[in-house]
C-alpha cells in the first residue's frame, strides 16, 4: 500500500473533469455551467450526451480546482442540482 496523500498526488491548480449524470432535461447543461461559474468563474463548454434510451443526459465539464476541499465542494454542489443522479 502506498503511503501517499491526495495532496501529494495532485498539483493545484488543476483542471479536473466532472461528469454529471441526470434526468434528460434541456436545461441540465446550463445548470451545471451555472454551478461551475460559482465554483471557478470561466468560459465553459460542456460536452452533453444522451443515454441510449434518451432518459438521461451526461454533462462533462472541466473545472479548475485549487485544493482538495475545492474538489469536494464541486462534487457536493454539482450533486445538489435538481435532477442529478450521479457525479463522477
Swiss-Prot record:
InterPro entries: UPF0250_YbeD-like, YbeD-like_sf
Domain of life: Bacteria
Residues forming coiled coils: none
Pfam families: DUF493 (PF04359)
An annotated GO cellular component: cytosol
Positions of transmembrane segments: none
Family that this chain belongs to: Belongs to the UPF0250 family.
PANTHER family in UniProt: UPF0250 PROTEIN YBED
UniProt protein name: UPF0250 protein Sfri_0694
Protein species of origin: Shewanella frigidimarina (strain NCIMB 400)
Amino acid at each position: 500500500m502506498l503511503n501517499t496523500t491526495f495532496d501529494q498526488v495532485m498539483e493545484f491548480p488543476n483542471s479536473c473533469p466532472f461528469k454529471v449524470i441526470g434526468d434528460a432535461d434541456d436545461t441540465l447543461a446550463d445548470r451545471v455551467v451555472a454551478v461551475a461559474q460559482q465554483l471557478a468563474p470561466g468560459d465553459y463548454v460542456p460536452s452533453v450526451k444522451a443515454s441510449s434510451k434518451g432518459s438521461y443526459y451526461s454533462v462533462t465539464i472541466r473545472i479548475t480546482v485549487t485544493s482538495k476541499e475545492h474538489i469536494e465542494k464541486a462534487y457536493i454542489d454539482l450533486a445538489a442540482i435538481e435532477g442529478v443522479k450521479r457525479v463522477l
